[in-house]
């Protein structure tokens, strides 16, 4: 019985492997371990046995499922699956993303943005629509205001890092990391994209969006200086002892000194004034002003960020304005004066009043002139 049990246990292996030679070896090993003579059992091919099993059909419903699971690969069920379209779309998307990432050095932030932008939309299309030729979509061109001719150099990175190091907002190491990340995202320096990233990273208040590079300073004045016109007035703390003033750009409070005329004289250790002297700004904003002016390919670098006047042409601009004002005043005075009605004298023409009565004088007589022409004509006719 032991030998038969061993044989039954070992018989499953050669049936699954479908090999008669291996079954004979296993049968001899089982008989040797049981110390009995090998039993001569006629070995028939295993494939007919597999064919005879379905004829019994003890469970006609469950048996085909077992055979289907064993013989058919699991990938064949995905073809009939309703979600197979989404699966293949996701696989195609992954391939495009990986190709795009391998061709370009992308950061994690940009990769996530690209993945979110290229996420496939779930839409059920008919077969007729899928068979039709795909329509060509117009490519949307993103407006970028960066200067392509100006490339990044290590000197520029060092200058920007040192400039922001002087502000005291960030450490040099963190500043260099942010600058490197910004360069990787934009690829260029000198345009609006780079300025926007730097200013938003380090100040947190000043944001320059949707403006060409040559109009950055103008938009800065319009958007942020006019917003804080009233913040330059002197204010006191609760104890009425410390005089404070707000930055005209970001609104930060800092100490100041009363100049005796109702205005604040800023302490240079905490704040400074713009080129025109009309606005008081803090050290942080003054560093941003200086950085904006040092960026190349940026027009109006000599203009005041507060009022927009060119500091190199203040005198000439004032003189020109004065001349224009004087001309305008003279013109207005002339227009205000009442015009006198001038009687126009009639022009003198040859009229019968000026004709002399003397028949001998033919200076002003038209009839005499006509007679002379008649005489000349007759004389010419006689000569002919």
Curated annotation (Swiss-Prot):
What is the official name of this protein in its record? Uncharacterized protein ORF122
Name the segments for region: Disordered: 327-358
The Basic residues compositionally biased stretches are 327-339
Q: Which domain of life is it from?
A: Viruses
